[in-house]
C-alpha cells in the first residue's frame, strides 16, 4: 500500500472507516502493519488483545495479532470483550500492554479502531504520534511469538462483582 491513512492516528486512539469486506481506511493490511509497529515501538514481549462485535473486528484482530507474533510478541487472545476487560487484563495478567479493537461509540458497521496500552496506561498524545512515525518508517524486527487463547471476561466480571 503506497499511502497509509495517517489521519486515523488520533489523540487517544486510532479510528477510521473499516468495512467487514476489508475495505476502508483501516484494512487488514493496516492492522498487520500496526501490530508490527506496536511491537517495535512498545518493545513488549507479551500482549493482551480483545475485540468488539463489529463486522470488521475479526479480520482486523487476526492481522493485528499476526503482526505482533511475526515480531516476536506472544499474544493473549481475550476474544470478544469490553474495553474495560482489556484494561483489567493489563492490570491482572502477565502482559506488558494491550489492544482493544473497537471504535467505541462510533457508528457500526462503518467504523473501527484500536485503543492501546503500554503497561497499564493507555497510549495518548505524543505517544500515538511516535507510534505513527514507527508505523510509517517500517524496518520491523522479525520474530516468532505465540497466540494463547485466554478468555478473560469471567475474571473481569467477577472482579466487578467482588
Regions found by a protein language model. Name each.
Residues 11-21, 29, 81-84, 89, ...:
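Surface-exposed loop/turn and secondary-structure junction residues enriched for glycine/proline
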Residues 39, 44-121:
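Ferredoxin-reductase
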Residues 1-64, 70-71, 146-162:
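An N-terminal, well-structured beta->alpha segment
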Residues 20-24, 59, 90, 98, ...:
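Generic alpha-helix signal with a bias toward terminal, lower-confidence helices
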Residues 112-162:
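Gly/Ser/Thr-enriched, mixed-charge loops and adjacent short helices
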